[in-house]
Amino acid sequence: MKCIDKLLSLLLVACLGLGLVSCGSESTDQTSYDLETTSYQYGITKVNNISDVSFYGSNLCVTDQDNFGIDQVDSQVAGAGGVFNLATGQCTYGQNLFGKMYPASTTKILTCLVAIEQADLDTQVTVSAHAADQTADSSVANLAEGDAMTLKVLLYGLMLRSGNDAAIAIAETIGGSEEGFAKLMNEKAAALGATHSHFVTPHGLHEDDHYTTVYDMYLIFQAAVQNETFLQIISTPSYDVSYTGADGQAKSQTWVSTNRYLNGKESAPAGFTVVGGKTGTTYEAGYCLVLYSYNDQNQPIISIVYNSDCTLNLYYLMNELLYTFGEAPS
């Protein structure tokens, strides 16, 4: 037993000696990781000068606070909200920023972004029986089985009319199924840092396991508004669409935006120009709105209200948020 103890002691001393050698300055100099050259060499970055590297999150509005500014507005009419100044990189208002929320049809922001990035906008989409089979109270683009149009046209039905039929048709075309497309949605959300979200449908009809947070939706939306096609779609008040029915005959209709700032039913505060956004409503999610606008200093603002108790209060609080927290810093 003593021999074993002695042997272990000798081995321990030897290991410590090796450890001390490995911690010496000469060895460190020879093996140290050079972020600037090694990242370029191994393809981690695409630039060979560290000053040119754009780090993830460097242009994002960042906060670790869940609630701030809620006493300055009528926040009690909603479950969560946030205001983000993209010019200054500041989150100027937060209400339950990181709390789990049901997004309803604001889900379609991610659906639209994934579709734009994953497929050719000229792809022909034919509406399936499953996509066309919606309940009477479902938000639809009034599509029938066999209707055919390009993906780009269908995206207007998704974002303006908030068509659940359009969402399913898009998902089936790109992902093979709703489940396959949801996988793409979750991959994109994770890539954007929206790690407290999980999506199971392309439309946002209630599922217990389909959720996000105000901050995660900000991360998704700020990426989406950098896409010109996405901006073009969400800023359109109404869209006259022509497409082909299952019988080969031409069909047409007009899709009007559900965003009350765009359809003329609500006005933004003086000095603000609304570009567009996405509405959403279910019993569980309440009344939701994700909005992109500019203040009088031409600074882009993202503002979000989730789980409001009615349409009137949804837009009332949104205007309060813009007026109180969307102005340029003095």
Task: For each feature predicted by the language model, list its residue ranges.
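Bacterial peptidoglycan biogenesis and beta-lactam-recognition machinery
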Residues: 116-124, 175-198, 214-245, 263-270, ...
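Bacterial N-terminal signal peptides
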Residues: 11-19
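Generic alpha-helical structural context detector
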Residues: 156, 160, 168, 172, ...
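Active-site-adjacent loops and short helices of periplasmic peptidoglycan-processing enzymes
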Residues: 26-215, 224-225
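Extended amphipathic alpha-helical segments with heptad-repeat/coiled-coil character used for oligomerization
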Residues: 249-250
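Structured C-terminal helix/loop/strand segments within mature extracytoplasmic catalytic/sensor domains
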Residues: 4-6, 20-78, 86-93, 97-100, ...
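Bacterial N-terminal signal peptides that target proteins for export
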Residues: 1-11
